[in-house]
């Protein structure tokens, strides 16, 4: 089995409680999320997601997920998604850091 494509979809997920608050008066009503779909030549697909909520909470921004995935996708296409340690190594070689983007592919595999 080999990965044939990596697709990303952006969606704003509303908080069930209305507003999410954290330190320094920060609040958001939706979580900007990227849903990742990894497709294989066996007709199987896997899904993962990345939902960073900004630099006041984590060192990650939702706007950075798609560009990071553009660097990561070519590294994993053609690979067997069941060999997750190899996938992780290839992602690390393709892009330093950005675990918030790598986790979506990791979960999808």
Residue ranges and their predicted role:
Residues 1-47, 51-56:
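Structured beta-strand/loop patches that form or line metal/cofactor-binding pockets in enzymes
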Residues 5, 39-109:
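Metal- or metallocofactor-binding catalytic centers and their adjacent structured scaffolds
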């Amino acid at each position: 089995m080999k990965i044939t494509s990596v697709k990303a979809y952006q969606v704003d997920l509303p908080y069930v409680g209305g507003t999410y608050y954290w330190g320094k008066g920060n609040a958001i009503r939706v979580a900007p999320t990227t849903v990742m779909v990894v497709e294989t030549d066996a007709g199987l697909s896997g899904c993962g997601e990345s939902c960073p909520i900004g630099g006041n909470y984590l060192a990650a921004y939702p706007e950075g997920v798609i560009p990071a995935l553009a660097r990561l996708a070519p590294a994993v296409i053609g690979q067997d998604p069941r060999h997750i340690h190899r996938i992780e190594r290839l992602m690390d070689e393709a892009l330093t850091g950005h675990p918030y983007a790598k986790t979506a592919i990791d979960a999808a595999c």
